[in-house]
Amino acid sequence: KRFDMNYTANHIFPTSGAAGALAHALRAVTSPGDDVLTFAPYFPEYNCYVGMTGANLRVVPANTADFQVDFEQFEKMLTPNVSAVLINTPNNPSGAVYSAETLKKLAQLMEDKQKEYGHDIFIISDEPYREIVFDGKKAPYVSKFYDNTLSCYSFSKSLSLPGERIGYVAVNPTCTDADLLVPMMSQISRGIGHNCPSSLIMMGVE
């Protein structure tokens, strides 16, 4: 409701924090040998999350002027081997918040490349700092700009629950195979021995 999105329970996969959300989302939309792009500076554990899928993390150099996307570099690196783009806004460690203009341009470029390459390219949006913005700024909701978005969230920061390990993946209802991705993540969870988050903590957050 907050973001005017038509999510249903079929589009939400509860996880043990944002780390669990990223691990499941990446496994759901990548295959071994694929490339996953992210933008410098980035959270160093992305290396582990992507590496465990068998995919390759490729880092787009930072735009140090304002830490928005360097689109010239991004377009060069957005090759047919890319299956996902991992973004983090508000960003850890820079604190930068991607503007609506940046997200629109990012989405348009990725949509064009999907058509050119003939396959889906997903955005995996890492959003644990979504509520931590200052000076009257707002963090635009990434999934509003691009259909093939999986939003990964943690309540650790927004509710000060870092030790309780509670988060989720929200699959955009208009995403390709949206109704299949949550069941897929459920099977991934079983395969890697990843336990569901505590029902007690889920009730507390609710």
Predicted regions located by residue number:
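Charged, low-complexity, helix-prone segments enriched in Lys/Glu/Asp/Gln
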Residues: 113-114, 121-122, 168, 188-189
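Glycine- and other small-residue-rich loops at beta-strand/loop junctions that grip anionic moieties
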Residues: 39, 121, 194
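Conserved core of the PLP fold type I
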Residues: 1-118, 130-145
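Walker B catalytic acidic pair
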Residues: 127
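Conserved core segment of the aminotransferase class I/II
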Residues: 148-206
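Hydrophobic "anchor" residues on beta-strands that sit immediately upstream
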Residues: 84, 122-123, 150
